[in-house]
């Protein structure tokens, strides 16, 4: 095993010592948990994160292109569904039922979408 010497800030030393203390308080033996073992673990984790980020940069995935395709599909779906709702509202099977009038269906959909969006993206009164 190679020996590595690195200089870190006092804050980092403090945080590593807190991890060591917490592990020992949880019942780990002093031979199992040390400043060195925790530092090695954190260094390995940091290296994995760094390598994962580098792989992402080299990836052929293009977020902007993905967003464009996703938006295009959503708009096509919205347009298609609007046409289907229009056709359905003219059906003689639902004629006279206000629940299936086009304007009422659109309003109902908007209300349901609005409540779902509010659930995930609550409006802030402060803005």
Swiss-Prot record:
One of its GO terms (molecular function) is DNA binding. Signal peptide: none annotated. It holds the Pfam family Tra_M. It is found in: Cytoplasm. The keyword DNA repair does not apply. One of its GO terms (cellular component) is cytoplasm. Keywords: Conjugation, Cytoplasm, DNA-binding, Plasmid, Transcription, Transcription regulation. InterPro entries: IHF-like_DNA-bd_dom_sf, TraM_DNA-bd, TRelaxosome_TraM. Homotetramer. 2 homotetramers cooperatively bind to DNA although they do not contact each other; cooperativity is achieved by DNA kinking and unwinding. Part of the relaxosome, a complex composed of plasmid encoded TraI, TraM, TraY and host-encoded IHF which binds to the F plasmid origin of transfer (oriT) in a site- and sequence-specific manner. Interacts with TraD. Also interacts with TraY. Belongs to the relaxosome TraM family. Conjugative DNA transfer (CDT) is the unidirectional transfer of ssDNA plasmid from a donor to a recipient cell. It is the central mechanism by which antibiotic resistance and virulence factors are propagated in bacterial populations. Part of the relaxosome, which facilitates a site- and strand-specific cut in the origin of transfer by TraI, at the nic site. Probably autoregulates its own expression. Plasmid specificity is conferred by the TraD-TraM pair. NCBIfam families: PRK13713.1. This is Relaxosome protein TraM. The gene is traM.
